[in-house]
Structures are given as structure tokens and as C-alpha cells.
Regions:
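Periplasmic c-type cytochrome electron-transfer domains
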Residues: 19-25, 45-59, 258, 271
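Short, structured secondary-structure elements
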Residues: 2, 37, 55-58, 70-281, ...
């Protein structure tokens, strides 16, 4: 038996110990795994172990066969979630939106959780769901108009295509660090930009180190870190690698020590790299990978290629573990190491699990989805939430309520209601009159990650984008940043009074609760024949669950009057007036100073606040009651948390 350390060390009657810690070649289990005798070989049935799996077992035994024991009788595990709760959780966690009625019905016919996970991992919306996370981590910070501090190019399109293609993370990092392609039209060269920054590559160095190595070097920008072991020299060596040439430390990137010492007290910080010092490109993280990793670089004369090789080399277990920890934290609500971006501050709560996940990540070809599949299929992920927990249990006995990303909340509201995500172009120069360096068109959004800050130096009403701003206001209330001057790995998830207020009274709330002709709930109300079934379908559509008895009773009472006559006969519907052929007036940078531009924009803002007209296909009184129900359901706390 191998389900306990005692049994493994005891072994069988003839073979001796199945495992001899520190000596894989003396362990009976390894002898059986490597045996050519079909009567002795392990496993006796099925596929034999792969070379990588054998190597993993050999390493584990040679490293001592560490077998941590937990007092299981002191632990209380929550049961697995019910099927519908699991379905909503896994949909939002993988593709950022809840399942449709059709997807729910298909799952109820065949409630195979593994199959659903496999299907979702091939869904193109996987990329949409991860975009906001990597925009934060990599500080993607484009500005529609004139660049300000630490603006980047919009490398979002390369990032989006990389996620759509499920690009292996070692390739992903290599392409990002090469910074080739278009600076202003979506390529990774946009990552190289840090406008109004005296040493752009030092800024990029802090991003790269936290994102892929869990090394926090922000303090080392101007002085040696007082709380970490990293020196300013280390950061500037990394910056020189990213810049492919030596870098001189500017005066603006150093703390004036004469002023710090002026008070007479010994300062907490030290400056060991003087302004004007020239720093050569050099790998500063020998503890993660040695010089032999540089041989993997495609171009040994390109320090960016060398840096990418050093970070992604198989011997660099830190890169694999940091990335695996990020994926784990995204799905589980907390990392095995916290904070995920600063491994000097945090230590693994489960070091063996962390090592195993890192090695699985490498073995799987640095494939994010391969690791996601392992986590999503685990019982730890699929357990029921304990609503009394503020944070997930360190032993993962139960998930805690997990606040969704702002993009997940907004995208889920639009997807579940069936209301089209309709905004202006993310651009203030729609007639393309300005240079690309001073004006960027980021296209027509279909998901909320595609938005960016609408602020600009002019701050004039004519340069407002009212529909984008309405969505951005909701996103901002839930922790989204329109401007990302610095990288972050975890957003502020604390509740605030603005969150319920902006959903219940804001412009987006009007759009979602107004039953217009293009609203999904309007279509549902027109096709259902039974009120009982309609209420069930409404709850499934919006909340991926059936109503409770109390909810069913309350909503039946509210909607029963007039349900039978809710549909207005087509002959009684007044036809809409024919559209005018007058050309719609537009506002762009080229005409925003005209007085009429402000008038046009203010009219657009009023129209945005008003929303689309209500449908004439439903009786007005009954439609108003259904809109009340819709308002109540869309303001339920369930929209903000993973179930």
C-alpha cells in the first residue's frame, strides 16, 4: 500500500521498503516501475509511466520523499458544490460570464464536470477573461490622447492574440521581452514605452521581475531597498538588459543622501549607486538560473533574448512556480505564496504542492490551460463556499466568498441579460487627423477589458465619451483602473457604498433594467407560455439557479396580474417613424473646439442616460412590474461574488 508514509516505508514481504528516502535506486517501487517483467511491473494495468513521471518520482525519493502529515480528524471539509453552482463558478472563472440557458440545459442533460471544463478551456472567451489580469500585471497603460506619465503603447492586441492562441508562457515572455512589432498599433513594442519616464527600462524591470519572478524591486528604482535584499545596482543591470545597452543612472533616479543625513539620524535607506554611474547589462538573479541558461538564447548577442532565456529556462524553477502560483491564486482566491508578486515577503504554505505545480507546468509545455485543467478538476476547487470565511482556508478545506473582477461583473451583467455591449469607439480622433504618437484608436469594444481611461488634458465636455464613461464608472467602483502607471497583482476588493449605488441608480443600471426590443429578457417574456416556467427560466438565465420557495411565491404574486395578456398584438403596435437620412453629426479632436461640438456631445450624453426606448411588444403595466423584478435580481449580492 502507498496511501500512507508508514505503509510505503514498510513495503511488502518480499521486496522490502517500497520507498527508501534519499535512495531511489534502493526503493522497491522504482525497481517495479522500471521492471521489464510483466508480472512485477508497476502499474500492472494501463499505460506505463512516462520518462518525465519517472524522473519526478526519482527526484522526490532522492530529495527525502517528504510526506507531510495533517491531522485529518481535525479538519472539516465542505462538500462539493451542487451542479448549477459549479457551473456558474467555472464559467465565470474561465470565460468571465455565466452560462446561457442553452448551455445550462445541455449540462443538465449530461452533468459531466470534466467535459464542461474541457469545453470551456477551448472557448475563445478564455482570452477575454484573462485580459484584465495581465493588463494589471504588465501595466498596459495606453492613453487615447497625448501621453502622460508611464503611458505605454496598446500592446493589448498582441496580449489578446497570445491568450487566444494559448501561447506557451515561455514563448509569451520571450516575445514580450523582445518588444518587437508596432508601438502604437498593438504589438509588444508598445510594452517598451514608458512616456515621461527618465529611465523607461528601469520601470519595465520592476514589472518583469514581479510578473515572472516574484521579485519586488520598486524601491530599488531610487535607492537600495530597506525591506528587500535587492540593490539599485540589480535593477539597473536588469534595465540595461532590457535596453540592450549600458544605462547611466540619472540624478532624478537617486535619493539625495546629503539631505537625508541632514537630520543627524541614521537613514533607513542607502544609496550605493551614484548618479552618473554607467551600468552594464547583467543577469542579477543567479540564485534562479546560472549562466548556462543563457545558451538557450536564440541570439546570444541580444541581451533581451538572453534575459528571456534566463527567465524561461527549465532550470529556473522560480519562473514556473511564480506563474503556476498566479494561476492557482486566480482560481482559488489566494496563492500558495502571498503576495504572489513578492516571494521574499511570503513563503509557500504548501511547498511540496508548489514544487509539484511548477514541475507540472514545465512538463505540460508552460501551458496555462493544462495547469488550469488540473486545478479546476480538483476537489479543492469544487468544494462549497463557506460564507463565514473572509479568506480561503490555508488548507483549502473550503473556498471563501471571492469577489469577482470588475470586468467579470460588468460582462456577466450584459451577457446574462442579453443586452448588447454598445459604446462609442475608444478614440477621440475618429477622423484620424492626428499623429499616432498623440492619438490612438483602440476600436469598438465588445468586452469591458477593451476600455481605457477617458481623462484627457483638455477636460472639455466635447471630448466626453458618455457611454464608455458610464461603463467605466461601474468598473472603477469595483476596482478597475483606467490608468495603470504601475503594475498590481491584486486589486482592492473591499466593499464600498458606491458599488450598490452605481448599479441600482447609474446609467448602466438603466440600460440593463429597461426592457427594450434588444433585451434578452424581453425575448424570454415574449416566448414563455407559463408564468411558473418563466420565473424559473429568469432565475436560471440571470443567477444560474432556481428560485427559492419564498422567491417563487413573491415573484409569482408580483407578475401574475396581466401575465396572460402581457403580449401586445402586432396590429396594436404603432410603427416606428422612418429613420431620417440626415447625416449624424460627430465630434472629434479636429472639431471639438467648435461650439456645436459641445451641443452634440451633450445631446449624446442625455441619450446615453435615457437609454433605449422600452419595447412596445409588452403591456406597459406588466412590463414595469417585470422591470422591478429585473432591478431586484440584478442588484443581488450574487453578482459580485463567485458562488
Amino acid at each position: 500500500r502507498l496511501d500512507s508514509l508508514a505503509d510505503a516505508l514498510k513495503g511488502g514481504k518480499s521486496d522490502g521498503a517500497a520507498i527508501e528516502p534519499g535512495k531511489a535506486d534502493h526503493s522497491a517501487m522504482m525497481a517495479r516501475i522500471l521492471s521489464d517483467d510483466e508480472d512485477e511491473v508497476m502499474p500492472p494495468k494501463g499505460k506505463p509511466l512516462t520518462k518525465d513521471e519517472i524522473a519526478l518520482l526519482t527526484t522526490w525519493i532522492n530529495e527525502g520523499a517528504n510526506w507531510p502529515e495533517i491531522q485529518a480528524d481535525h479538519l472539516t471539509l465542505t462538500p462539493l458544490t451542487d451542479d448549477l453552482t459549479f457551473l456558474r463558478r467555472v464559467y465565470i472563472d474561465t470565460i468571465g460570464v455565466p452560462p446561457s440557458l442553452e448551455e445550462i440545459a445541455a449540462f443538465q442533460k449530461n452533468p459531466d464536470r470534466k467535459a464542461v471544463i474541457d469545453t470551456l478551456l477551448t472557448d475563445a472567451r478564455w482570452a477575454d477573461n484573462w485580459m484584465g489580469y495581465w493588463q494589471d500585471v504588465l501595466a498596459e497603460n495606453p492613453n487615447m490622447l497625448n501621453p502622460t506619465l508611464n503611458n505605454t503603447g496598446p500592446f493589448r492586441w498582441w496580449l489578446y492574440e497570445s491568450l487566444q492562441d494559448n501561447k506557451p508562457m515561455d514563448f509569451f515572455v520571450t516575445e514580450l521581452l523582445r518588444m518587437k512589432g508596432s508601438e502604437r498599433q498593438g504589438g509588444p513594442a508598445g510594452f517598451a514605452i514608458a512616456s515621461q519616464n527618465d529611465v523607461p527600462m528601469a520601470a519595465k524591470g520592476t514589472i518583469v521581475s514581479t510578473a515572472f519572478l516574484g521579485v519586488e524591486m520598486k524601491c530599488a528604482r531610487c535607492h537600495d531597498s530597506p525591506t528587500h535584499k535587492w540593490l539599485q545596482q540589480d535593477l539597473f543591470e536588469l534595465a540595461a538588459m532590457l535596453g540592450t545597452k549600458e544605462i547611466a543612472v540619472p540624478k532624478t533616479s537617486s535619493v539625495p543622501m546629503d539631505k537625508i543625513h541632514a537630520g543627524g539620524r541614521k537613514p533607513l535607506i542607502q544609496v550605493t549607486l551614484q548618479p552618473g554611474t554607467k551600468v552594464q547589462p547583467k543577469w542579477p538573479f543567479d540564485e534562479f538560473a546560472d549562466e548556462s541558461a543563457a545558451k538557450l538564447a536564440e541570439d546570444a548577442n541580444d541581451s533581451r533574448d538572453v534575459l528571456a532565456a534566463m527567465i524561461t529556462a527549465p532550470q529556473n524553477e522560480r519562473f514556473a512556480q511564480v506563474t503556476a502560483n498566479r494561476i492557482w491564486a486566480r482560481f482559488m482566491g489566494r496563492g500558495i505564496v502571498e503576495p504572489v508578486e513578492d516571494w521574499e515577503k511570503g513563503k509557500p504554505t504548501h511547498p511540496e504542492l508548489m514544487k509539484w505545480l511548477g514541475r507540472e507546468f514545465v512538463r505540460g509545455g508552460y501551458d496555462m490551460k493544462n495547469l488550469a485543467r488540473i486545478i479546476l478538476n480538483s476537489q479543492a476547487y469544487q468544494r462549497s463556499t463557506d460564507s463565514t470565511l473572509k479568506l480561503p482556508s490555508p488548507l483549502y478545506t473550503s473556498p471563501a466568498p471571492r469577489r469577482l473582477y470588475a470586468e467579470q461583473i460588468v460582462d456577466s451583467l450584459f451577457a446574462a441579460t442579453g443586452k448588447p455591449f454598445h459604446t462609442e469607439e475608444v478614440c477621440l480622433d475618429i477622423d484620424n487627423q492626428r499623429d499616432l504618437k498623440n492619438s490612438i484608436n483602440m476600436g469598438k469594444p465588445h468586452r469591458s477589458w477593451m476600455l481605457t481611461s477617458t481623462s484627457n488634458e483638455r477636460d472639455r465636455p466635447s471630448l466626453a465619451l458618455p457611454r464608455i464613461q458610464a461603463v467605466a464608472d461601474v468598473l472603477s467602483a469595483f476596482g478597475w483602473r483606467g490608468s495603470r502607471q504601475d503594475p498590481i497583482s491584486k486589486r482592492d476588493a473591499d466593499p464600498n457604498v458606491l458599488q450598490p449605488a452605481i448599479l441600482s441608480n447609474g446609467t448602466v443600471g438603466v440600460w440593463l433594467t429597461r426592457l427594450s426590443d434588444d433585451h434578452g429578457v424581453t425575448a424570454l417574456a415574449l416566448q414563455e407560455e407559463s408564468l411558473d416556467h418563466f420565473i424559473d427560466q429568469l432565475f436560471l438565465k440571470l443567477l444560474t439557479r432556481k428560485p427559492t420557495e419564498q422567491e417563487k411565491k413573491a415573484y409569482t404574486q408580483h407578475l401574475s396580474e396581466g401575465f396572460a395578456s402581457r403580449i401586445v398584438p402586432a396590429s396594436d403596435i404603432r410603427p416606428l417613424p422612418a429613420p431620417t437620412r440626415e447625416r449624424e453629426k460627430y465630434v472629434s479632436w479636429s472639431n471639438h473646439l467648435d461650439g456645436e461640438a459641445t451641443t452634440v456631445r451633450m445631446a449624446q450624453e442625455a441619450a446615453a442616460r435615457k437609454g433605449e426606448p422600452p419595447t412596445a411588444k409588452l403591456n406597459t403595466e406588466w412590463r414595469n412590474r417585470l422591470e422591478d423584478v429585473l432591478w431586484a435580481l440584478l442588484n443581488a449580492p450574487e453578482w459580485a461574488f463567485s458562488p
